């Protein structure tokens, strides 16, 4: 049986509590949830701000893996892009969806220079970069703008799911598909049928 280190417990507790309760949760509650003393926390992290940033960064790869199709997925770019929105629908349908942790944190912090906001921006850029790479593969005319628009649809769908406290009903997938259609980005099957 492996025992997690105090640092790992703090990062895990911080990730859960900051996303569920907000970044203004007290250090006492955070340390209690992690089973770590405040003294230990401040020996491991210079500040709560550093802990916010590191907890976001540590969760990034697993959050991306939930959303992005893997490199072994060889479907057309359009299908790979729409997979992100389908997986978002699945996360929302689980019933405990609290929105995108990166957008939520950045909105709550209200300071673009805060270390947590910097990390949030970095991971949101990963999503935009994923869309951009796929759009380039698909031969989209303006992949930069289209990638930003897809990211906005993703973030808007996340916000809608939280505000309305209900499933998205596929609206993110439908909206992204309509945008891709308007840009002429089709899967190979659709392109063959249209040609």
Language-model features, listed with the residues they occupy:
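Hydrophobic alpha-helical connector segments
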Residues: 54, 67-96, 137, 147-150
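Short hydrophobic clusters on alpha-helical segments that form packing/core surfaces
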Residues: 10-18, 88, 131, 154
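Short, solvent-exposed amphipathic helices
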Residues: 69, 115-126, 130-133
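Amphipathic alpha-helical segments used for helix-helix packing
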Residues: 92-118
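Short, basic, alpha-helical segments at the C-terminal edge of helix-turn-helix-like DNA-binding modules
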Residues: 57-64
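Helix-turn-helix
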Residues: 9, 13, 17-54
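Hydrophobic/aromatic-rich alpha-helical bundle segments in the mid-to-C-terminal region
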Residues: 115-121, 136-195
């Amino acid at each position: 049986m492996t025992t997690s280190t105090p640092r790992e417990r703090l990062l895990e507790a911080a990730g859960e509590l900051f996303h569920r309760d907000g970044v203004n949760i007290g250090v006492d509650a955070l340390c209690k949830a992690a089973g770590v003393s405040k003294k230990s926390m401040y020996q491991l992290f210079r500040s709560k701000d550093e802990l916010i940033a590191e907890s976001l960064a540590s969760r990034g790869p697993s959050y991306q893996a939930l959303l992005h199709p893997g490199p072994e997925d060889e479907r057309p770019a359009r299908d790979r892009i729409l997979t992100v929105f389908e997986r978002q629908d699945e996360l929302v349908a689980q019933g405990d969806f609290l929105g995108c942790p990166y957008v939520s944190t950045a909105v709550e912090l209200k300071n673009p220079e805060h270390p947590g906001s910097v990390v949030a921006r970095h991971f949101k850029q990963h999503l935009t970069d994923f869309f951009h790479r796929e759009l380039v593969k698909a031969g989209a005319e303006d992949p930069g703008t289209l990638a930003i628009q897809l990211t906005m649809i993703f973030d808007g769908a996340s916000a809608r799911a939280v505000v309305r406290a209900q499933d998205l009903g596929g609206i993110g997938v439908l909206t992204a598909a309509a945008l891709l259609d308007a840009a002429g980005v089709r899967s190979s099957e659709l392109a063959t049928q249209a040609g």
